[in-house]
Amino acid sequence: GSEGNTKYRLYAVVAPSISSQFSYAKLGQVITGIERLGFHHVVEAALGADMVAYTEAKELADKGFLTSSCCPAFVDYIEKAFPSLKQHISHNLSPVATISKYIKETDPDARVVFIGPCTAKKAEFQKERVRPYIDSVITFEELQALFDSRDLVIESLPETILDNASYFGRIFARSGGLTDAVRQALIERGLDKTFEYRPISCDGIEQCRAALF
């Protein structure tokens, strides 16, 4: 926690799945719980997808085929199993790293902790490109353990509204996942006329393998 800490500000970047993970409480109560742990701001990782989408749309139109850089396990899988496709991995930082970089650039005293469902993100924040932007990664289970250690009963807390638009302005008004954000960015950049957009979403390693073949 960062109570009594005046040297830096602690930011929690939360994965979109946080709303379904803590099914026994409302999202606003979970956000309050995170703030009670000593975080100054709670920021949605989804904002990073909007930031990535604009540059990713151009890269997609240039290359004709692109795989997302969102999931570090998927990126590692392509590098090992399909090395010839390596050039088609998006060169952008993942949405989480992108929003974390933005936070660090706008607040030099920021420390960023990513909270998400997947341990693969722990490997991502060790990577050289990402290390400057993300200071730590914890899973939802670890977050729950922190709540328990502070005797925070989440379902009895008041709700805090997650209003990131006020921090980050209108640039992030779009939502609907990376595929929708890229589709919108193609239109905004005038690339939709010359490029046919056919996103494929895969759930799990088998679907990924089948799609890449």
Where are these regions (language model features)?
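Iron-sulfur-associated redox domains of electron-transfer enzymes in respiratory
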Residues: 2-213
